[in-house]
Each structure stands twice: as structure tokens, then as C-alpha cells.
Amino acid sequence: MEKIIEIQDIVKNYQIGSVIVRALRSVSVDIRKNEYVAIMGPSGSGKSTLMNLLGCLDTPTSGTYILNGTDVSKMEDDYLAEIRNKEIGFVFQTFNLLPRYTALENVMLPLIYAGVGKVERERMAIEALEKVGLSDRMDHKPNELSGGQRQRVAIARALVNKPSIILADEPTGNLDSKTSIDIMGLLNDIHSNGNTVILVTHEEDIAKYAARIIRLFDGEISQDVLNKDFSYN
């Protein structure tokens, strides 16, 4: 399968006062199209930094990041924003929904940024909400939805632009165990439909849903293994 992510010798340093924090130390990893990967690690391991780089929310201090054939390592913010909107669908722990907007309006937002016309973006947003089982909640605002329903809206928003990658950061962190299982089942379905899914988590039970598990420790990859319990649907 063709590579969608190629990271080579990535270093990320932060300067805090007079101290240099080495968040990532020469990290190299490839991810192929339609892979389902979990990135794990304790607090301070560098997993959040790696997620920010993978999501084009930040750029490395040094090293190379090729995303779907494009070198994004040294891109300026405006270009990174275009790449993000085109290539990556984000699912966050805190949902990041706008409280005054309905579910449908929240899902349409990436399409507005992409310049999609009103009729077409409404059609695409309705289709995305139907895929996550929320066809009867489109006109509800976030405070009228359960936590699981809010996360489904967030997943619909992530899918609506038909991105190359779904990047899920602790997607079940604010959910109870039953709702977490439902949401992970939905991510499994998304992967089965051909999407590349990258899951950032500290929970072993959640990481087991992925086909491959990458563990970070002190800014380095300490383990990169296939999940023997993973089964393709």
C-alpha cells in the first residue's frame, strides 16, 4: 500500500526561558494509506507534539515530513491551513463544537473554509451526519446533545471534506465506557471504508482497536508493533 505519511529524523525543540525542551528526538516513521495506527505514550513522551506535527498544527525544528506526496516540513501557516483543511479530519477529546451553531452548521464549517457553495455544502453535511447516525439531530445545538452525540457530530465534521487522514486525539476521553465502545465502533467503520485513521491515546483498551501500535517514550519511538488481536472487518 502507498505511503501517505513519511517522517524522517524529525526533531522538535521548545525553548522555555533559558531551557531547551527536546520534545521529539530524531523520530522516523511511515504510515500507509488505509492503515489504522494508535500512538501511545505517557505524559511528556512526545505523543501530543507528534500529533500536532502530523496534523500540520506545527512544524518540526528539523527533519522531513512528507504528507501525501507534499513536503510540509517548512510550510508557512497559511499553506499549512490549506493542507489541514484538505488532507486531515480532526476528532478531539473536547469535541470543539461551536455552541451557538446546530449540528448541521458545525459540520458545514470546513466546507465554508474550503469555498464550497451553500447548496452543495448542506448536501455534503447532511450526508456526513447520516453516516454517523444523526439524521434526526441535525437541527440540535451541542447543549441539546449527549456526549456521544457531540462526538458523532465532531466525527461527521472530520469526514465531510473527504480527507486523506482522520486524526483522533483521545476521542473517548470525555465519554463513558458504553459510549466509548460505540464511538470506537464508528471509527472502525470509517477505517473499513478506506480511510487512514491515526488514534492518539494513553488508554490500552482504546489502542487495541488499531492494527498497529506506536509507543513513544522521552521523545523517541520505543516500540512499533502490529496488533496481533486486530481483525479486519
Sequence positions of predicted segments:
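ABC family nucleotide-binding domain
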Residues: 2-216
